[in-house]
């Protein structure tokens, strides 16, 4: 059974409700995202999470800035959606923060070599996600072709994302990935989680 990360958690009530139900809870710090939180709100969100592992998620923040914010708020993992240099990993390590690099899929991307390269970096996990601007849909509404996900799922600590919902999660779970990562698929509205959908997701992947 895969581990589960619920991303885009933007309020304390959802963070508390999810705590312990899933392994990872993601807080997005990205102005362009409808699920973004403000830096000053991270402390309260972090305090609501006692059992799960919180993750700071960003794309546009300079990596060192993201690591500093995570360290200051006792958030142990930074998931960064831009290309990272070796010194970014070194700096994160010096601050006691783990890094989750991201392999972004766009139509035509050779996904496996990209994932294999990221797996050679010091990583909490490697996330495979679709480009946020992509409108492409594949099996079950997934944003990445299932055949490509099947290629990368067994390579290591690979987390799969991109249009996963309770309805299509069994397709992804059959690939036996290290983790699945879901945001909009378990929402009532952007940044507001629907706990019935969360439970349906967990049931769909054999967790309940």
Swiss-Prot record:
Q: In which pathway does it act?
A: Amino-acid biosynthesis; L-tryptophan biosynthesis; L-tryptophan from chorismate: step 3/5
Molecular functions (GO terms): phosphoribosylanthranilate isomerase activity
Question: In this record, what's one Pfam family?
Answer: PRAI
Q: Which GO terms describe its biological process?
A: L-tryptophan biosynthetic process
Q: Please name the source species.
A: Pyrobaculum arsenaticum (strain DSM 13514 / JCM 11321 / PZ6)
- Which UniProt key words apply to this protein? Amino-acid biosynthesis, Aromatic amino acid biosynthesis, Isomerase, Tryptophan biosynthesis
PANTHER family, from UniProt?
N-(5'-PHOSPHORIBOSYL)ANTHRANILATE ISOMERASE
Report the EC number(s), separated by commas if there are several. Answer: 5.3.1.24
Instruction: Say if the entry is tagged with keyword Repeat.
Output: no
Q: Got any disulfides in this one, which pairs?
A: none
Spell out the protein name for this chain: N-(5'-phosphoribosyl)anthranilate isomerase
CDD domains in the cross-refs:
PRAI
List the catalytic activities from the record: N-(5-phospho-beta-D-ribosyl)anthranilate = 1-(2-carboxyphenylamino)-1-deoxy-D-ribulose 5-phosphate
Enzyme class, spelled out: isomerase
State the family named in the UniProt similarity comment for this chain: Belongs to the TrpF family.
């Amino acid at each position: 059974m895969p581990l589960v990360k619920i991303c885009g958690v933007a309020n304390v009530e959802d963070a508390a409700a999810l705590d312990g139900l899933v392994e990872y809870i993601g807080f997005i710090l990205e102005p362009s995202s409808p699920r973004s939180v403000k830096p000053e709100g991270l402390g309260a969100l972090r305090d609501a999470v006692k059992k799960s592992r919180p993750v700071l998620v960003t794309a546009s923040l300079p990596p060192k800035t993201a690591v500093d914010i995570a360290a200051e708020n006792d958030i142990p993992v930074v998931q960064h959606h831009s290309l990272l240099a070796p010194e970014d990993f070194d700096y994160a390590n010096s601050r006691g923060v783990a890094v989750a690099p991201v392999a972004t899929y766009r139509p035509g991307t050779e996904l496996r070599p990209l994932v294999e390269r990221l797996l050679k970096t010091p990583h909490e996990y490697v996330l495979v996600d679709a480009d946020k601007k992509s409108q492409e849909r594949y099996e079950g509404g997934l944003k990445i072709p299932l055949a490509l996900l099947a290629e990368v799922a067994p390579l290591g600590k690979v987390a799969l994302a991109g249009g996963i919902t309770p309805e299509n999660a069994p397709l992804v779970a059959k690939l036996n990935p290290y983790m699945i990562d879901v945001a909009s698929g378990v929402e009532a509205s952007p940044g507001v989680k629907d706990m019935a959908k969360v439970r349906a997701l967990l049931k769909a992947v054999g967790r309940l």
